[in-house]
Regions:
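Residue-level marker for the onset of beta-strands and adjacent loop->beta junctions
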Residues: 9, 42-43, 86, 99, ...
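Short amphipathic alpha-helices within nucleic acid-binding modules
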Residues: 24, 95-102
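N-terminal beta-strand motif that seeds the catalytic metal site of vicinal oxygen chelate
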Residues: 1-22, 85-88
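Core segments of cupin and vicinal oxygen chelate
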Residues: 13-63
Length: 134
C-alpha cells in the first residue's frame, strides 16, 4: 500500500533557456506560468500542468550541467540508454493521434513515432527543450 503521507509534488528541470522552455510548455501543452522568480541567482519559473507543478530554472553559478542523452529506439522499446530519469509521462484525455498531428504542425519533434504500448494504449514520445523526453 502506498504511503498516504507522500504525494507527488513537482518535476524540476534545469534549462539553458528557462523562459523559452517555459513558454514551450505553455504553447505545446497549455501549461500556465504561475510564478517567475530568481532563486540562488537564476530564473526559476513555476508552471501548472495537469494539476501538477513543473519548475524550470536556469544555470546557477558554479554549476556545469551536462547535456541529456537523446532518446533512442531499440528493437521493442525506446530509452535514453543512461541511468536516471528516462522520461516523464502525461495521460492525454482525448484523440492522441489528432493531438500528435497538432504538435507536429507546431514543429514538435518525435524521437519515436506513435505506437501501441504493452497495455494496448497508444504511446507518443515528444522531444521537449533541454533534452527532456515526454
Amino acid at each position: 500500500m502506498s504511503n498516504p503521507a507522500f504525494t507527488f509534488d513537482h518535476i524540476h528541470i534545469i534549462s539553458q533557456t528557462p523562459h523559452e522552455s517555459a513558454n514551450w510548455y505553455v504553447e505545446m501543452f497549455g501549461a500556465e506560468i504561475v510564478a517567475d522568480k530568481i532563486a540562488y541567482g537564476a530564473p526559476q519559473i513555476f508552471l501548472e500542468l495537469g494539476g501538477k507543478t513543473l519548475i524550470i530554472r536556469g544555470h546557477r553559478e558554479g554549476e556545469t550541467p551536462m547535456p541529456a542523452r537523446p532518446i533512442q529506439p531499440f528493437a521493442r522499446f525506446s530509452s535514453h540508454n543512461a541511468w536516471g530519469t528516462d522520461h516523464f509521462g502525461f495521460l492525454y484525455h482525448g484523440d492522441l493521434r489528432a493531438f500528435h498531428d497538432e504538435l507536429r504542425a507546431k514543429g514538435v519533434q518525435f524521437p519515436v513515432e506513435l505506437k501501441q504500448g504493452n497495455g494496448g494504449h497508444l504511446l507518443c514520445y515528444v522531444s521537449a527543450p533541454d533534452g527532456v523526453s515526454i
